[in-house]
Amino acid sequence: LLKKSYMPNSRAHWQKLFDPKAVAVIGATPEPQKVGYSVLANLLRGKKRDIYPVSVSQTEVLGLKAYRSILDVASPIDLALIAVRADIVPQVLVECGRKRVPFVVVISAGFKEAGEEGKKLEAEIAAIAKKYHISLLGPNCIGIMNGRSDLNGSFAVEKPLPGEIAFVSQSGALGTALLDWANAHNIGFSKFVSLGNEAGLTELDFFEYLATDSETKAVLVYLEHVSDGEKFMALASRLAKRKTVVVIKAGRSARGRAAVASHTGSLAPADAVFTAACRESGIIVIDSLRDLFNITRLFRLGIRRPLKRLVVLTNGGGPSIVASDAIDSSPSLELAELSEKTKKKLRAVLPPMAAVGNPVDIIGDASAARYQDALKILTAERDVDGILVMLTPQMMTETLGTAELILKFSKKKPLLPVFMGGAAIQEGVAKLEEGGLGNFWFPEDAIRALEALSGSRKKKARVVPTAPTTPSQLRPMEYPAMEKLLRKYGIRLDGTLVRSPRGLASACKKLGRGPFALKVVSKDVIHKTDAHGVALGLSDISAVKSAWEEISRSIKKKHPKAKISGMVLQKMRVGKEVIIGMKRDPVFGPAIVFGLGGIFVEALKDTSLRVAPIDAKAAQMMVKEIKGLKLLQGLRGEESVKFAALEKLIVNLSRLALSDPKITEIDLNPVMATATGILVVDARILR
């Protein structure tokens, strides 16, 4: 991909960012309160590199010779870290360009997040980076870190420990909080990237790089906005095929989106569309920072793929019941069924009072040796994917010895330690941290993390098509043009357009016996029902004519300037009501919605969503994942609807939506689904 960073996608080039031989710190200072001091000091604490402080006021900084300009440095520079006032950055960046520095990290703030003047400055540095082919990270970021190469090119308090997790974040503050927590729990990182305002490099560049980074096994991402929806899905899919990718997205609520806009100057895509795009790309979406931290624990345990069948091993009944309830209520986890052979083995080594079902309760006086006996048997059980090892402190509890055994048996099967308590368990917890496993303080945290990893905690993508927020700018297509467009894509509208009352008699005769429905056709009336523009259950031609007059009066009263193009006459149809629609997302493009219609769409919002294009397989999944599927399959002897017809309609609507970028919304509502096919009873297309 050729992006605004103009960055060659080669390992050697990326090496200059993540393991540079020569680094310049522009804005280096001996004053500890300033960013330039912290960045330089952090670099000096790491692996030996050639480090060049650049300062217009100093000849020496932290024992190193300082240069007035990066141009005064004779040696080539791989990476420049800029920590000067925002208004000076353009000049400094030009000097980096003249020096042919391949990577520049602008840590300085005061750009688009600060208002119009800052926005102009950011556009200027983006143009400079483009001119000189500089791969620019930032501005307004913490910096760059690599736990594997001992690089801390940031002003974070600590550097990351070596590990196999990459963290890519549009929030520097969240990054430093996660880093501090991770260091306290002995969790390492391969790469640690603060994106800042993304004037050059974006999350997409790092998705592309990390897909082939052998040092990274899992990727955590914090996003406030997406720079390019189509490329996001393509690169995220590629990354997710090779690594486990977990994203937490901020700006989901209306209030949250407003905070995002003020913080980064970017608009957030709709939550439901973002979630659908991630799901289609194979990315796990989580809802909370707590889930983010707990999934990081799972990655440290080496758990990067979902576990399903769990055993709870405990020395306390109460906590294990809580854990069992949480597992039982999970859509993606289950308590493993232990074989009679396994239960017999457990009975042979455990006290008579012990419970050998699941949970396996080895009772309160359990020693480390008893935990060992149980773990030896359970870790050999093929039908068990993982074990929650719970411990509560009693007088005879051997927390340290038990922790040592857990470390030993964790090499045979995934073990999730849950040592509950405080001071009495600290020695054991410290041993678990030291050994690289760590501890979940509550069983719910471990279970939530496993659920999130399986995707079952992921918020389901659901939206209900609504009227546009700016109806004065968006108008429905005229009925004949809409009918023609729908027909072109294999979507036939039910009913007959009648231009005047004179045509009602022949239209009724053509349709046969009633009851009938009559609906106004006007590009000036978006919501027909609200304007009393719909009449239902009309028994004969006389009732139809009366309804025409009543609808005409209502429209004239509600919308005096509205032009009525005619009315659609239909037979009242029987079937299962569904809704199929499209809303064009500004980031990801057409989002297709399917769900139950009628009262269900308003009251239950039972819908599924995908980003176009949608093929037959995706359409089938959309239909099957709504909660009301059984209503469509038929209850108490009812016939099932014709699912193939529904799925074909979804695919055709996806094709239509992609054909014209000016179309902002499409509603097919209701669509009557029956055992023999479908009927599109009403439609609306907004352009």
Model-derived features with residue positions:
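Catalytic-core regions of core metabolic enzymes
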Residues: 2-687
